[in-house]
Amino acid sequence: MNNLKNLRGTVDLFPDQLIKWQNVERILLEQLSRASIKEIRTPILEMTELFIRGIGEGTDVVSKEMYTFLDRGERSCTLRPEGTASVARALIQNGISSNPLQKLWYMGPMFRYERPQAGRQRQFHQLGVEFIGHDSVRSDVEIIALAWDILSKLGIKELNLEINTLGDTNDRSNFQKSFLKWLQANKDSLDLDSQNRISKNPLRILDSKNIQTKKVLENAPRLSNFLSEKSHSRYLELKRQLEVLNIPYVENFNLVRGLDYYTHTAFEITSGALGSQATVCGGGRYDDLIKQMGGPNTPAIGFAIGLERLILLAGKELEIPRNTDIYIINKGLIAESFAMDLSRKLRNYDLLVELDLSGASFSKQFKKANKLKSKSIIVIGDDEAVNGEFIIRLFGQSGNGNKEEVISFENDIKLENWINNNLLLK
């Protein structure tokens, strides 16, 4: 029988790998909390119709990449490929009109059937931030600045911000008519994939990575020439406010993002350290999405960050585990019982405590404590347990003033003083 293996494009993460993940997630949550952004959790599994209506039937995500199946009730279900549509659905279903202004974040696994490579998996993890009900340029700038600051805080190098405006629905409609006419006239000069997009999702051709097509597109109509005065003024104000905040940017007039729901501001943050998979964060405004899905007219803007790519880029210092504060060495039936009780008591001090359960010799337990670089150790043998006491010392030191103490199991005050003087004040 063949050995069971994980599916291609999924990975197992073990404790030593998760140190960096947990440190990255901790920093993310700290930054979001400081910005007064609240968490929302939505199901991983949704009705397929949600993504067809929300993302767009002609997008690559919906047409090629979704994990979709019929459940036992013959309903078409999909593992979520992104989070914005689910957030919009949740807000509509639960009465967005009662709280129209919200700043929300979510984090969790998403699923897309793509070719796996470094920083890209079929099950991947994403942080998303959504500002709901906010329509001012200031909210665009705030969310871009938040994404920029989060990535900077994580020590990501060679950051570049690319921005564009997609205008409103009328702007885009007028541009698309002209662009389609141009595409038909230049169809034979495009790569095959772009030719296939003409009838399905022509705007995505602007984002083509094909060298030949990119050269041809240099002569294509520009969306910026079809902007209304209002849309143009909004874009100018976006750039002005970014400059006030000293956030450097580059205009990319072909930046359209991969989903149909974007309007006005679109942006990506890339890192030169990532090579071909340079995009770390992408987002934009989606003022029509909630209304399009059956809710009230609600402006919104958001971004998403792929955690796998963050892990590749984040600083090495985030791989360093927190050292064990106290390692409890114990040997003997009576000692084991006391050690178990003591470990529970010590964790109330917000200490990282490891209780040795191996039953190995004292010397082997000392070696394990040394390997873990434990700051201190407690030693309990049956002799100490019978006397109702234990030895606590800073690891590697013995008989050095208050660095080592013999403490009664009942003397909580003496134990607390030792911890305060030797661990918590360090």
UniProtKB/Swiss-Prot annotation:
Signal peptide: none annotated. It comes from the Bacteria. One of its GO terms (biological process) is histidyl-tRNA aminoacylation. It catalyses: tRNA(His) + L-histidine + ATP = L-histidyl-tRNA(His) + AMP + diphosphate + H(+). The keyword NAD does not apply. SUPFAM superfamilies: Class II aaRS ABD-related, Class II aaRS and biotin synthetases. The keyword Protein biosynthesis applies. GO terms for cellular component: cytoplasm. Keywords: Aminoacyl-tRNA synthetase, ATP-binding, Cytoplasm, Ligase, Nucleotide-binding, Protein biosynthesis. It is an enzyme of class 6 (ligase). This is Histidine--tRNA ligase. CDD domains: HisRS-like_core (cd00773). Belongs to the class-II aminoacyl-tRNA synthetase family. The gene is hisS. Gene3D superfamilies: Anticodon-binding domain (3.40.50.800), Bira Bifunctional Protein, Domain 2 (3.30.930.10). Homodimer. Transmembrane segments: none annotated. One of its GO terms (molecular function) is histidine-tRNA ligase activity. It is found in: Cytoplasm. Its EC number is 6.1.1.21. Pfam families: HGTP_anticodon, tRNA-synt_His.
